[in-house]
């Protein structure tokens, strides 16, 4: 049994660990800001934005993926909502936001969602959140907040 475990561990390490094989014929349907006509309140400035009045994000943030010490791709994403109130007396008892995701172009370990936090710039409350994606590839990511969902597709190139 120990021999089998060592063989499995060796194959995992030799294969690149987290990097599972993608489907080479797959074309990632990356979400573009132009697919959306949403314009947030003027105080947020020019886009590119994606979403609805109740939940939106900034498209250019999807392009910044760094690797952490374990080899996961970790973006910091900002999420916005016209209904979000950052003051402590209005914080919901449940989570502000949860994020789920799945790889579209091949097998992968699951996305890891840490937590969402409130954030604030003068007159502009928002939510920050981090996810850990175990592999490069084509990912569908969905934010869930107060019954609203927002889904987009990104391609992470190693």
Language-model features: where?
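N-terminal secretory signal peptides that target proteins for export/translocation
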Residues: 1-2
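Contiguous segments within soluble domain cores/interaction surfaces
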Residues: 20-134, 138-158
């Amino acid at each position: 049994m120990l021999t089998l475990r060592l063989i499995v561990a060796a194959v995992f390490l030799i294969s690149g660990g987290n990097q599972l094989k993608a489907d080479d014929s797959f074309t990632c349907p990356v979400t573009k800001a132009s697919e959306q006509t949403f314009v947030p309140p003027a105080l947020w400035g020019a886009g590119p934005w994606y979403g609805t009045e109740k939940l939106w994000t900034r498209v250019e943030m999807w392009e910044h993926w760094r690797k952490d010490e374990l080899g996961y791709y970790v973006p910091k994403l900002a999420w916005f909502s016209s209904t979000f109130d950052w003051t402590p007396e209005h914080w919901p008892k449940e989570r502000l936001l949860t994020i789920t995701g799945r790889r579209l172009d091949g097998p992968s370990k699951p996305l890891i969602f840490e937590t969402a936090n409130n954030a604030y710039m003068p007159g502009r409350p928002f939510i920050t959140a981090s996810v850990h994606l175990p592999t490069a590839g084509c990912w569908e990511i969905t934010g869930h907040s107060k019954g609203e969902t927002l889904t987009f597709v990104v391609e992470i190139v190693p």
